[in-house]
């Protein structure tokens, strides 16, 4: 029984050591370059003002056009 416990401890120690080696290799590995599409998406997500600006642009240009279209339709009957 003592032999099996020793074997289990040695096995656990080796697995733990290999896990640490892989962890450190992962930390030291250079990060891959992001794809251009991913950078554009990240920029859009990082700047919430850009989304609000787009909404405001649609409202300021589209809303008056919509109001004038509704007025024309009412005048036509």
Swiss-Prot record:
The keyword Secreted applies. The modification Glutamine amide is found at residue 76. One of its GO terms (biological process) is killing of cells of another organism. The modification N-formylglycine is found at residue 51. InterPro entries: Melittin/Api_allergen. The record marks 64 as: Important for the flexibility at the center of the helix, flexibility that is important for the stability of the voltage-gated pore. Residues 31-50 form a propeptide. It comes from the Eukaryota. Keywords: Allergen, Amidation, Antimicrobial, Cytolysis, Formylation, Hemolysis, Ion transport, Membrane, Porin, Secreted, Signal, Target cell membrane, Target membrane, Toxin, Transmembrane, Transport. It is found in: Secreted; Target cell membrane. GO terms for molecular function: porin activity; protein kinase inhibitor activity; toxin activity. This is Melittin. It comes from Apis cerana (Indian honeybee). The lineage of its organism: Eukaryota, Metazoa, Ecdysozoa, Arthropoda, Hexapoda.
